[in-house]
Structures are given as structure tokens and as C-alpha cells.
């Protein structure tokens, strides 16, 4: 499995600050830590009576979702609103794209409305990078998920969840379980865990749902759930993505649950204080039983809460990086 993007200077300005957020591939550990630290500082905003800070006042954030989403779209909207930005959410099913307008033309029109930032989710891998290459230089682009490729804000909210519950990545064993082949979350989590110094990253699933060459990410591959879960600190369950599957990859959902579904009995093989995560939406009785999803080890709802803070961090840092680059360009032009 070859990652679509190597290190992307496009994501950073000339001073090494974030200006787009397209993938975690190639981003330095220091920058990922800065995102986590910034997100940590934003968590208290959600506990205020007035849940707003003025960092993006006067800015317009456009959510352009070409795939259905509940958590990602809603948390991006809340994140932008809590930063005091104006928010536009494009309903693709009623937009001109459903009448034949191209993605490029749609974004050009939004650009003409003086939007400052696009949050884009698209079914095509590489869509967010394409947009970042073609929008005007003043617009920041945030990847809300593109095909099988990347979901960088989900990756970072997962890292914040782990850090807040476990403190450090340096001695952790983390298992990512399920449909690895179709999961952009798995790719982003693997990249983030490796960059942040996690020494033991495991992927667990049927052979048909594990990409060829995944070992290049520095992970250990298991096709037996009990063996893979032994003594892990963190279990990240993945949604079974039937909508992306070709025929023959999986006999049935029941068979998948029998072999790879996370039950209380199977979780007992992990460490006693292990945490259980899931990016959602959860398919109960397919990837995970309700007793685990709702049990004492589950931090799934924490992930949703932390997602708002992480997206606030990314939006504010990308806008700050764009502003710094604009000022630098103006100084160089004089």
C-alpha cells in the first residue's frame, strides 16, 4: 500500500506553520503536539456559559461535504462557531453539483463569495489536496475525509483522546481492529501514532480487509483477534464499510462479528485499564457489542467532545498560518 502523499510542503507556510490540513503524512511531531496542546486549551471553552472565543471573528468557513456525515460536519460547524466565524454548510444534494457543475467550479464560486476556509469531505482520494492546489492562496483547506486516503482531524482527535486518558504515547500498545482496507481513519491513526512515538501499533482483521504492504507504516499485522488484543492499552474499532466493498471480501456481517467483533470476553485479553474507541457510526452487533460500546472501558463519547476542540485548533492554526504567509508575501513584495 503506497500512501498518496509524501511530505507535503503545501500544508505549511514558509515558517513551518500550518496553512492547510490535508494529511498527517510528513507533518513533524512538534506540529502534531502543538495541535494537541492547542486543542487541550480549547476544551474549557465548551464548559463556559458563552461558548465563544473571537479568534476567527469576521472570517467565513465553508463546509463542503460531498459525502454524508453527522459527527464530522456538526463538530466542524460547532468548532467554527465557537471561534466566532461565520459558517456556510453546502448541501451538495441541492447544490449545482447535482446539476453537473464540477467540484472546481463550485469552489471557484464559493471563493468569489470571499470564503476564507473550506472544510471538504469527498469520496475521491486526493480531492482535498487537489482543491488546496487550485484555490486562491489566501484560502485555507481542511480535509474532512477523502476516500480511503485520509481523515486527519479524526486522527488527531483520536490522539487527543489517547493522550488525555493515557498521558503519553511512549510505552503504549495500540490495536486498530476491523476494516483496515477501506478506512481513512486507520491510515491517519497509524501515521499519527508513529509520529508521536507509539512503539507498538497493531492492525487486526481478516486478510481480505488488510492492505498489502501495510507493514511500511511500522505496524504489526494480526489475523487473530485474541492474539492481537493481548495486553494492549488502547483498542480502536473501525466501522465495517460495506458501501466501499467489492463482492467477496467478507462472507457476512455475522461471520465478521463471530471472528472480529469486540465483546466483553474478548476485551478481557487487553490490559485491565484499556480504553475502547470507535470513530462512528457504530454498527452494534457487527464491530462491537453494546455492553462494550456503553461500558466502563468505552471513551467513544469523549472522542466526540474532543473532536470539537481538535477542529477548533486546526481551524485557528490554519488561519493563523495563512495570515502569517500573506504578511510575509507582502513584505517580500516591497
From Swiss-Prot:
Which reaction(s) are listed as its catalytic activity? carbamoyl phosphate + L-aspartate = N-carbamoyl-L-aspartate + phosphate + H(+)
Q: Which keywords, in A-to-Z order, does the entry hold?
A: Pyrimidine biosynthesis, Transferase
GO cellular component assignments: cytosol
Q: Which residues bind L-aspartate?
A: 99, 184, 239
Q: Which residues bind carbamoyl phosphate?
A: 71-72, 121, 151, 154, 280-281
Give the UniProt record's GO annotations in the biological process aspect.
'de novo' pyrimidine nucleobase biosynthetic process; 'de novo' UMP biosynthetic process; amino acid metabolic process
Q: Which PROSITE patterns match?
A: CARBAMOYLTRANSFERASE (PS00097)
* SUPFAM superfamilies membership: Aspartate/ornithine carbamoyltransferase
Which Pfam families does the entry link to?
OTCace, OTCace_N
Write one Gene Ontology MF term: amino acid binding
* InterPro entries, sorted: Asp/Orn_carbamoyltranf_P-bd, Asp/Orn_carbamoylTrfase, Asp/Orn_carbamoylTrfase_sf, Asp_carbamoyltransf, Asp_carbamoyltransf_Asp/Orn-bd
Broad EC category = transferase
EC number from the UniProt entry: 2.1.3.2
Q: What Gene3D superfamilies does UniProt report for this protein, alphabetically?
A: Aspartate/ornithine carbamoyltransferase
Q: How does it assemble?
A: Heterododecamer (2C3:3R2) of six catalytic PyrB chains organized as two trimers (C3), and six regulatory PyrI chains organized as three dimers (R2).
Of which family is this protein a member?
Belongs to the aspartate/ornithine carbamoyltransferase superfamily. ATCase family.
Q: Which PANTHER family match?
A: ASPARTATE CARBAMOYLTRANSFERASE, ORNITHINE CARBAMOYLTRANSFERASE, MITOCHONDRIAL
- Known role: Catalyzes the condensation of carbamoyl phosphate and aspartate to form carbamoyl aspartate and inorganic phosphate, the committed step in the de novo pyrimidine nucleotide biosynthesis pathway.
Name of the protein described by the UniProt record: Aspartate carbamoyltransferase catalytic subunit
Naturally occurring in which organism (per UniProt) = Pseudomonas putida (strain ATCC 47054 / DSM 6125 / CFBP 8728 / NCIMB 11950 / KT2440)
Amino acid at each position: 500500500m503506497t500512501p498518496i502523499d509524501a511530505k507535503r510542503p503545501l500544508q505549511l507556510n514558509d515558517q513551518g506553520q500550518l496553512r492547510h490540513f490535508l494529511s498527517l503524512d510528513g507533518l513533524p511531531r512538534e506540529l502534531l503536539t502543538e495541535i494537541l496542546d492547542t486543542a487541550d486549551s480549547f476544551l474549557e471553552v465548551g464548559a463556559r456559559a458563552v461558548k465563544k472565543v473571537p479568534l476567527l471573528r469576521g472570517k467565513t468557513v465553508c463546509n463542503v461535504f460531498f459525502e454524508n456525515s453527522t459527527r464530522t460536519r456538526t463538530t466542524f460547524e460547532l468548532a467554527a462557531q465557537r471561534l466566532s466565524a461565520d459558517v456556510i454548510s453546502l448541501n451538495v444534494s441541492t447544490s449545482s453539483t447535482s446539476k453537473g457543475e464540477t467540484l472546481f467550479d463550485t469552489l471557484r464560486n464559493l471563493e468569489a463569495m470571499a470564503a476564507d476556509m473550506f472544510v471538504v469531505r469527498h469520496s475521491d482520494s486526493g480531492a482535498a489536496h487537489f482543491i488546496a492546489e487550485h484555490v486562491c492562496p489566501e484560502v485555507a483547506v481542511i480535509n474532512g475525509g477523502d476516500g480511503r486516503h485520509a481523515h486527519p482531524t479524526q486522527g488527531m482527535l483520536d490522539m487527543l483522546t489517547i493522550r488525555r486518558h493515557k498521558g503519553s504515547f511512549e510505552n503504549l500498545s495500540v490495536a486498530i481492529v476491523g476494516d483496515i482496507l477501506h478506512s481513512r481513519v486507520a491510515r491517519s491513526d497509524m501515521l499519527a501514532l508513529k509520529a508521536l512515538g507509539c512503539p507498538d501499533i497493531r492492525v487486526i482483521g481478516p486478510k481480505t480487509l488488510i492492505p498489502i504492504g501495510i507493514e511500511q507504516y511500522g505496524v504489526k499485522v494480526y489475523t487473530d483477534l485474541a492474539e492481537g488484543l493481548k495486553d494492549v492499552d488502547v483498542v480502536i474499532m473501525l466501522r465495517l464499510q460495506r458501501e466501499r466493498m467489492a463482492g467477496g471480501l467478507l462472507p457476512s456481517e455475522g461471520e465478521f462479528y463471530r471472528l472480529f467483533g469486540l465483546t466483553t470476553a474478548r476485551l478481557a485479553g487487553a490490559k485491565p485499564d484499556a480504553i475502547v474507541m470507535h470513530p462512528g457510526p457504530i454498527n452494534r452487533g457487527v464491530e462491537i457489542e453494546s455492553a462494550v460500546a456503553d461500558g466502563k472501558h468505552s471513551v467513544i463519547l469523549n472522542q466526540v467532545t474532543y473532536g470539537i476542540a481538535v477542529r477548533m485548533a486546526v481551524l485557528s492554526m490554519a488561519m493563523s498560518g495563512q495570515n502569517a504567509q500573506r504578511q510575509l508575501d507582502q513584505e517580500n513584495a516591497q
